[in-house]
């Protein structure tokens, strides 16, 4: 991994990525799983690089009585060719994960854009709203026509308290 990529990976606050980007649980857990597998692979690579890769066959010949075994092992090691592994299946899995992550990211982008539009419309409504002191009874009747019938019914029945008001807001009367 390049120094730039390593520095960029260390600069990211991975704990807050999911909450800041509002990722769904599946995407967040997939990222966490990928990060843990990557950390394990980097640790394993570090331990393997620290190990010695050369074998001193002269030492084994001097210690062991059966020198033919040492000669066979040495010839086997010299003729050893590492097996080339076909990485296509793993690359396909990585590409599938990347496609799924991209699709999830696009959905998240659309959700965020829709939420931003909704919030900006709400903010515009709040900024353009009239102060409550300027709202008249006629404005209330026009906005909610059934309020006039409700008030007339309450007045004819002699009810001056809105049902449920005291339970919700408490009794503010002095007496």
UniProtKB/Swiss-Prot annotation:
The gene is atp7. This is ATP synthase subunit d, mitochondrial. GO terms for cellular component: matrix side of mitochondrial inner membrane; mitochondrion; proton-transporting ATP synthase complex. Mitochondrial membrane ATP synthase (F(1)F(0) ATP synthase or Complex V) produces ATP from ADP in the presence of a proton gradient across the membrane which is generated by electron transport complexes of the respiratory chain. F-type ATPases consist of two structural domains, F(1) - containing the extramembraneous catalytic core, and F(0) - containing the membrane proton channel, linked together by a central stalk and a peripheral stalk. During catalysis, ATP synthesis in the catalytic domain of F(1) is coupled via a rotary mechanism of the central stalk subunits to proton translocation. The keyword NAD does not apply. The modification N-acetylserine is found at residue 2. Belongs to the ATPase d subunit family. GO terms for biological process: proton motive force-driven ATP synthesis; proton motive force-driven mitochondrial ATP synthesis. GO terms for molecular function: proton transmembrane transporter activity; structural molecule activity. It comes from Schizosaccharomyces pombe (strain 972 / ATCC 24843) (Fission yeast).
